[in-house]
A protein has these predicted regions:
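Short, acidic, metal-binding catalytic loop of nucleotide-sugar glycosyltransferases
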Residues: 1-9
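A conserved acidic beta->alpha catalytic loop
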Residues: 3, 16-24, 64
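Acidic donor-binding/catalytic loop of UDP-sugar-dependent glycosyltransferases
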Residues: 22, 42, 60-76, 147
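Glycine-rich, basic loop-to-helix element that forms the pyrophosphate-binding segment
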Residues: 29, 36-52
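Short aromatic/hydrophobic "clamp" motif used to bind/position activated sugar donors
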Residues: 57
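Conserved donor NDP-sugar-binding/catalytic core segment of glycosyltransferases
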Residues: 68-97
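Acidic donor-binding loop at a coil-to-helix junction in glycosyltransferase catalytic cores
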Residues: 139-145
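Hydrophobic helical membrane-anchoring modules
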Residues: 147-203
Length: 203
């Protein structure tokens, strides 16, 4: 949240799905607008986007930090013809295995033009509304949005880097996590049940 203001955001909306910590209070004290919403992430993001007033939207996970000048970089990309995109990614933790994971993720997004949610997806607000926002899925909502926009030829991966948490890779292991992610992607494309995919992700 602080990184969003530091990156130049004029409006920061925090969606709280019923947390029991001090998230809402801290967000308000920092100058953000707080919305209490559903626990389903895609629905929370859609509610926040509906109330946003800017011409562009940046969806920032709680454990992801925007770089200085990140908002200006988004506006520049949108002014240059992009309608959707994300940033390169770096993990906050120092472990060597995370450097490998970063390279894999950044290579994947550069090739596919499908940034995931932890890469701070951005989109023109009018385009987001025309598309009907995120599909209300328990998982893959960020990937599904990226897939819909990839065919436009106007998706952009910015050279600037967001910092995010690598705790999932550290807790579950690099190759196990990567293998699980690719299995979920493959099953999603094969028409797998998203509720089952969400369970697979949480295991």
């Amino acid at each position: 949240m602080q990184s969003a203001f530091g990156a130049g955001a004029a409006e920061v909306i925090v969606t709280d799905g019923g947390s029991f910590d001090r998230t809402a209070r801290l967000a308000k004290s920092a100058g953000a607008r707080v919305m209490l919403s559903d626990r389903l992430r895609s629905r929370r993001l859609n509610h926040a986007a509906e109330s946003a007033t800017g011409r562009s939207l940046i969806f920032l996970h709680a454990d992801t930090r925007l770089p200085a000048g990140g908002v200006a970089a988004v506006h520049e990309a949108l002014d240059d013809g992009a309608i959707f995109g994300g940033f390169r990614l770096r993990f906050a933790e120092p472990q060597t295995k995370l450097r490998v994971a970063e390279r894999m993720i950044n290579f994947r997004s550069a090739i596919t033009r499908c940034p995931w949610g932890d890469q701070a997806q951005f989109i023109r607000r009018d385009v987001f509304r025309q598309l009907g926002g995120f599909r209300e899925l328990p998982i893959m909502d960020d990937y599904e949005l990226a897939l819909r926009l990839r065919g436009s030829g106007r998706s952009r991966i910015l050279p600037q880097t967001v910092i995010t948490s690598g705790r999932r890779f550290l807790q579950k292991g690099l190759w196990r996590t990567a293998w699980t992610n690719w299995r979920i992607i493959a099953k999603y494309h094969a028409g797998g049940d998203v509720e089952e995919l969400a369970k697979m992700y949480r295991r």
